[in-house]
Amino acid sequence: MNAKIIIIGNEILNGFTKDLNAGFLIKTLIKYDVIVHNVVFIKDEIPFIIEELKQIKSIDFVFLTGGLGPTSDDVTSKALDIFFSQTKPKLLNNEIGTAPGLWYRKGKVNYFSFPGVPSEMKLMSKNLFSFFFDKKKKENTFFQVNTIGVPESKLSLLLHNFEK
């Protein structure tokens, strides 16, 4: 299974806010054997969001964060309404915020849109993943190896068997 993450927010692109959602989603999805192919950062503008959604090919899951709130620059739900035209989303409960998440399905692709507030996105995605992926969860073993002065090419040869 594979995924794409779309981070929406002018505040991130202009450097005022640090994105905390992409890394969390990537680490969490790995536990469910979902490989993230790319992460894209785009502006809070309907044409940019729709254009990015049109580029989706050969992806199982698309995760969007940001732009679901009540302010005038929160346009993600409007863009999704246009992109999915007559399809109504399933609403995802937001236990600690005001904006619900959205779940669409088009063909074989599941689209999940979460608020950009990290605490809200984390709780909502954990709840969703435990429902959606729980039976598929795998436990990975990770090793951290710290080295000094060893070229990457030599390390690659030494660690080749660990990658399997």
PLM region spans:
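Non-catalytic beta/alpha edge segments that cap or flank active sites
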Residues: M1-K164
